[in-house]
Curated annotation (Swiss-Prot):
Region of interest (Disordered), ranges: 1061-1085
Family: Belongs to the TRAFAC class myosin-kinesin ATPase superfamily. Myosin family. Plant myosin class XI subfamily.
GO cellular component: myosin complex
Coiled coil (UniProt feature): 890-1056
Disulfide bond sites: none
Entry keyword annotation includes DNA-binding: no
PROSITE patterns: DILUTE, IQ, MYOSIN_MOTOR, SH3_LIKE
Domain comment, as recorded: IQ domain mediates interaction with calmodulin. The tail domain is a globular cargo-binding domain.
Name of this protein: Myosin-14
Stretches assigned to the IQ domain: 741-770, 764-793, 789-818, 812-841, 837-866, 860-889
Residue spans of biased composition, Polar residues class: 1069-1084
GO biological process: actin filament organization; actin filament-based movement
Domain Dilute as annotated: residue spans: 1158-1463
Amino acid sequence: MACTTVNVGSCVWVEDPEVAWIDGEVIEVKGSDIKVKCTSGKTVAIKVSSAYPKDVEAPASGVDDMTRLAYLHEPGVLQNMKSRFDINEIYTYTGNILIAVNPFRRLPHLYNNHMMQQYKGAGFGELSPHPFAVADAAYRQMKNQGISQSILVSGESGAGKTETTKLLMQYLADMGGRAVSEGRTVEKKVLESNPVLEAFGNAKTVRNNNSSRFGKFVEIQFDQRGRISGAAIRTYLLERSRVCQVSDPERNYHCFYMLCAAPPEDIKKWKLADPRKFHYLNQSQCIELERMDDAKEYRETRKAMDVVGINSEEQEAIFQVVAAILHLGNVEFGKGKEADSSAPKDDTSNYHLKTAAELFMCDEQALEDSLCKRVIVTRGETITKCLDQESAALSRDALAKTVYSRLFDWIVNKINDSIGQDPDSEYLIGVLDIYGFESFKTNSFEQFCINLTNEKLQQHFNQHVFKMEQDEYNKEEIDWSYIEFVDNQEILDLIEKKAGGIISLLNEACMFPRATHETFAEKMYQTFKDHKHFSKPKLSRTDFTICHYAGDVTYQTEQFLEKNKDYVVAEHQTLLNASRCAFVASLFPLLAEDANKKSKFSSISSRFKQQLVTLLETLSTTEPHYIRCVKPNNLLKPLIFENQNVLQQLRCGGVMEAIRISCAGFPTRKKFEEFLERFSVLAPEVLDKSTDGWPLSSTDDVACKKLLEKVALQGYQIGKTKVFLRAGQMADLDARRNEVLGRAASRIQRKFRSYLSRKTFLMLRKVATNMQAVCRGQLSRLIFEGLRRDAAVLEIQRDIRMHLARKSYKELYFAAVSIQLGIRGMASRGRLRFQRQDKAAIMIQSHCRKFLAQLHYQRLKKAAITTQSAWRARLARKELRKLKMAAKETGVLEAAKSKLEKQVEELTWKLQLEKRMRTDMEESKTQENAKLRSALEEMQLQFKETKALHLQEVEAAKKMAETVPVLQEVPVVDTELVEKLTSENEKLKSLVSSLDQKIDETEKKFEERSKINEERLKQAIEAETTIVNLKTAVHELQEKILDVESENKILRQKSLIQASGHLPPTPVKGSQNGHFSSKESPFNGSEIETLARTQEQESDAKTRRYHLDRQRENIGALINCVVNNIGFNQGKPVAAFTIYKCLLHWKSFEAERTSVFDRLVQMIGSAIKDEGDNEHLAYWLSNTSTLLFMIQQSLKPGATPQQKTPVSTSLFGRMAMGFRSAPSSAETSAAAEAAAAAVIRPVVAKDPALLFKQQLTAYVEKIFGMIRDNLKNELQTLLSLCIQAPRTSTGRSLRSFRSSKTMRNNSPLDHWNGIYDGLNAILSTLQENFVPPVLIQNIFIQTFSFINVQLFNSLLLRRECCTFSNGEFVKSGLALLEEWCNETTEEYAGSSWDELKHIRQAVGFMVIHKKYRISYDDIAHDLCPILSVQQLYRICTLYWDDSYNTRSVSQDVIANMRVLMTEDSNNADSSAFLLDEDSSIPFSADDLSSSMKEKDFAEMKPAEELEENPAFSFLI
C-alpha cells in the first residue's frame, strides 16, 4: 500500500536501517522522486513507491483493532503496537487475531477475577483486547453454534505463550466449571496440571526464563450444558538432549533445581547436594533465577501433584528417579583393564554409580555393565563387546535421556487418567501452546522439527485468514475476486514428502549403521539441488538452508541422525524392567517386538510427523482462534520496544502475511458514519440540509456512494455497513481532503483577520464614546451638586422650626397630664382600700363554709364504703362456700385449696379493712364538702349584696361630686364611729388569720390522708389483682378436677367390668346388700394404689397430648394466616406484629424446646422462593426486619421479665380509676411508653429463641441481597447502553443534552430514563411495603455503587467511550440520577449520590476544555482527587476529542504519571485500575434497632382473621 500520489507537506513513512520505519514530512516532489525530512532530523531522497502514507489523525494511543487503521501496512501496524505498548496496552486485535506483547513484568490487575467477570458475555471487540475475550468468544461460539473450537497460541521463546495459555485455561475452567456444591475437581486438575508440566518440561533459555521445551495441546471437553466433563493433554517433541547438555547461560529443567532445594530430609534420603556439584547442572553458570524460589516451587509442585491425582508414593518415586538421573550424570569413565574398554573413573564415580543403582533399585554391577558393555546376539552365539570411554559416556547420556523422556510421558498419561476423558462429550475447546519459529546461530534437529510445525500451522493460518476475508466480503455482500496468497505447500513437500523428502532421506540414513551426517548431507544436496526453497551454504559441507515462510534458516546436520533415532538400548531396557521399584519397572515394560527379537525401525521425525497429522486433523474439525505472542526486546526488560525485533516476529507469526492477504483485497474498511464524518468535506452537497448539516432523508450508503462518485474514485465497493477501498485509495482521499481543508483554513484565516480588524475599530469607537460620556457626566454632576445644596438648606430650616414648636407643645401637655394624674390616683386608692376590706371578709366566710362541707362529705363517704365492703365480704364468703363444696370430692388438691382459701381469707380481710377505712374517709370528706359548699353559697350571696351596696354608694358619691362644684376638705366629726369600725376590723383580721391557720393545718392533714389513701389504694389494687389470679387458678384447678373425675369414672367402670369378668359366678361371702366391707374387698390395697397411679399417668399423658394438639393447631392457624399478604396497620406489617404477640403469649422465647420457630423459618423460606418478584420480596423484607426488631428489643442483654399489671375490671377498680385526676401531657407520653412496653417486653430467652433470631437475621440479609441483585440485574442491561452516546444516521455523537425534566423526554436518554424509572419503581415498591428506611438507603447506596463500578470500568475498557461527546452524554445521564436523589430525599437515598464519585470525576475530566494546559497536580488534587494514578493514566491515554479535535493532556503529564506508576509497580493493589464491586451486607441488627421505635407499635391491631378464633382471644 505504497503512496501513489503525494503532495508537499504530506506525512509519510520511510524505511530506516535502525528503527525499521521512521516518519517524516515531504518537502519536495519531483516526478516519482521525493525528499522527506524525517523526525530524527535527517533528510532522505527516495522513490514515491518506497514511501508509505501516515495517518496524522490516528489516535495517539493507537486503536484496539488494527483493521480499523486508515493505512494497513507494516509501519502503521508497528507504530500502532508501539503506541499501545507505551501506555501498557499489551493486547491488540488484527481482525480476529490477538497480538500479545510480553511486558516482562507482572500486571495483576489485568488478570484478576473482577477483570474476568467483565468479559463474561461481552461481545468480541466490545471491550479492550484480552485473552479472556478470545476465550469467551470460543466458548460462546461452541455453545451457540455447536462447533468445537481451538485456540492456537504461538510465538518465539520468551514471548509469553505459557502465561497466555494459563489465562485461557483459567477462563475456560471458570466458564465451564460446576457449582461449588457439585465439586470442581476436573477444572482444578486442569489448572494444576500447568505447574506440574512446567516443572518437568520448562527450562531457562537465552530468551526466556521459563521456556516450554515441549509442545502442548490441551483438549477441554464439555457436555451439552457447556460444563467441563473431561480433559486431555497431548505433548509434542520434548527436548531430551537438554537433560545431558546445557549451554551457558541456560538451565536444565526446573525439577532438578527444585529437588536440590528440597527439605533436608529429602536431600538426605536421596543423597543430594548443591546443584553446582552435579555434571548435568554445572555445565552452565546459571543456577538460580531472579524472583524464583526453588524451595517454594518444590512445595507448590508437590501440592499440584496432589491435586492432579499423583499420590505421595508416586511422587516419591518420581523425584527418586530424578535424583538417580543427577547421580548418573556424575559417573565419569576412564580406561578399563582391557583394550578399548571403560570403567568408572574414580571413587566419586563409583559412589554416584552405587547411589544411582540404589535409587533405580537395580544391581550396581548390572548398571555398570549396561553402561560399559554391549551384547550382540547372533544366530549361534552371544558376543559381549566393551565400549570405550566416549561410547560409555554416550550410553550414560542415552540412558538419562530415555529415563527422563519415559518419566515425562508417564506424568502426562497420569494427569490424563486422573482428569478423565469424557467419551460422550459434545464439544471441545483445544488450547495449543506450541513453540514459535526458531532461527539461531546453530540450528539442529529440534529447530528443524519446530519449524516444520510452524510451517504446518502457518498453512492452516493462511487458509483461515483467507476464509475470514471471504466471510467478511460475503457478509457485506460485495463483489470480490479471488485473493492470491502464498501457499507454503512446496516447503512442506520438501520436508515431509513420503518419497524424496528430507525426513524420508533422514530415516533412510538412520537405517544404515555406517551412515553419517556427511553422507546424509551429500544425499540431500544431490536430491534437492534444483529446489528453489533448498540451498547449500558456500562455506560448509554438511549444512543446508531451507527458505521458510519467515526467512532462511541454516541447519547443522551433525546431530540429526543420533537425535532422530528412537530406540532404547536392550541392556538398559532389561536392567530397568527388572528393577525392584515397581514405578521404575513400569517405565520400561516388555514390548512384543522385544520378544520376537525383531523391531520395525522407528524415528523421532516419523512419530512427530504423525503427531502433526493428528493435530491438524483435530484442528480442521474445530473453529480456530489465534493468539500471536510477541517479545518486545531480547533483553527481557520492561518498557523497551525494539522495532526490528517485533517486526521480525510479526512476519514469523504470520501477522504480516495476514495483513498482506487483507491488502490484496480491500485493506481499508470504514463504517458509513466514520467515512462520512471524515470525508464529507469533499462533497457536502450530497448531504441533505438539516439543522446540523447532516442527512436526514437519504441513507448513509447512498450518501457514501454519491461522495465517491463525486470524487471519481474507481474500484471501491459499498457493503451493507462499510465502505471497502482498494490499496492507495485512502491516501488519495486524504490528499484531496487535505487540499479542501487547506482552502478552508485559508478562508477561516481571512475571516478571522477581518474579525480582528473590525474588533479593533469597534474598540476604538467605544473608547471615544466613553470619554465623551465621562466629560458630560462630570458637568451634569457639578450642576446637580449646587441644586442639592440649596434644597438641603431649606430642609434644615424647616426641621429647626418644627423642633422648637414641638418642644413648647410637649411642655404644656405634660403639665396638664400631671395634674389629672394626681386627682385620679387619690380617688383610685380610696376605692382599692374598700375593695380589700370586702375581699377579706368574703375569704373568711368561704373558708368556714368549706370546712363544714368537707366534714359532711367525709362522713357520707365513710358510710358508703362500709356498706360496699360488707356486701362484697358476704359475696366472697358465699363464693368461698361454693369452692369448699366443689373441692371436697377431690383429695389430691386439698392442700392447694386450703392454702388458697387462707390466702383468700387474709386478702379478703385486708380488703374489707381497707374498704372500711376508705369508706369512712370518703363519708367525712363528703360531709365536709357539703358544709363547705353551703358556706360558700352563703358567702357568695353576702358578697353579691355587699357588691350591690357598694355600687349604690359609688353612684351616690358620683352624684354628690357632680353637685358640688369645688372639692373642699370636710373635717371628720364622728370619731367614735370610726374607732368602733376600726376595732371590728381588727377583730375580723385576727379571725381571718386564725381561720387561715386552721385551713393550712386542715390542708396538710388532707394531703397526708391523701397519700395514705393512695398507698392503700395501690395495695387494694394489688390485692384485687392477686384475688383475680387466685380465682383464675382455682377455676383452672376446678376444670382439672372435673377432667380427672370424669376420667376416674370411666376408669372405674372399666376396672369393674374387667373385675366382674374374672370373678367366679358364685356369690361372695363378704357382700352385704351389694357392697363389700373394707376387709373383704375384691382388690387389695397395693392393687388399688397401682391402679390409681396408672390412671394418673394416663390422664397426664392425655392432658399433654391435648395441649400439644392444641398448640399445633394454633401454630398452624397462625402460619396459615400470616403466610398470605395480610397488609399493614399504622405503617407496620400486621404479620410480624401478630407473630410476635403469639410468641410472647405462648412464652416461646422462654421454652427449652419448641417447634414454632422451625415452622416459621420454613414458612419464610418457602415464601421467598420466587426470587424475581420484588413486590413479594419487599413485603417479606418488611415483615422479617420488623419481627427482628421486636425480638431484638425483647432479647436485649441483661433483660429481666417484668410483671404486667392486670387491668382491674371490678367495681372497686373502676371507682378507684374514676377518682384519679385527668392526665397531663407528661402523663400521656408516659402512658404511651407504658403501652409500648406492654407490646414489647424484655424476656429471658433460651437457645431456640436465640437461634431463631440468628436465622431471622440471615433471612433479612438474604432478602435484602435478592432485592439488591434483582435491581442490579435489571440495570445492568441498561448500563451497557448508557456508557456510549447513541449516534445519528451519519455517526455524529449527540452532543447537547438538556437537564431537568426535559431530559426525560429526550430520546437519546431513553436508557437513562429506563434507569430513572427502574429506581422509582423499586422505591415505590419498598415504600408501599413499609420497608425500614435504613434498608432502602443501603439498597440504593449499593446500587449506585454498582452503577459507578460498571460505568467506570466500561469507560476504562472501551476506548470508543473515552470521548468528549460521550462524556457529555454520560454527564447528562448522571444529572438525571442527581435529580432522582434530590427528589427521593436523604431519608431514602442517603449518600447514594456520593457513590458515583469515580464516574463523576472521570466524566468531569472528559468534558473539560484545554486539557493540555492542565498540570498533573491540578488533575490529581482538584479535578480527580479520588482517582488513582493508574486510572488517570488510562483515561488520559484513551481519551480523544471527537467533537473539537483538541489534544489530551500534555506529554509531561503523561511522563509524570509513568514515573509514579513505575514507583508503585511492585504493589499489586496499586497497579489495578478497575473498581471492585462490593456485595457485602452493609447493615446490622443494631442499625434496625436504632432506626425504629417501640412506641410505633402501641396502637397496632393484630390480624382480623385470628380475632374470630377463640384460641387467639389474647390478641384483642
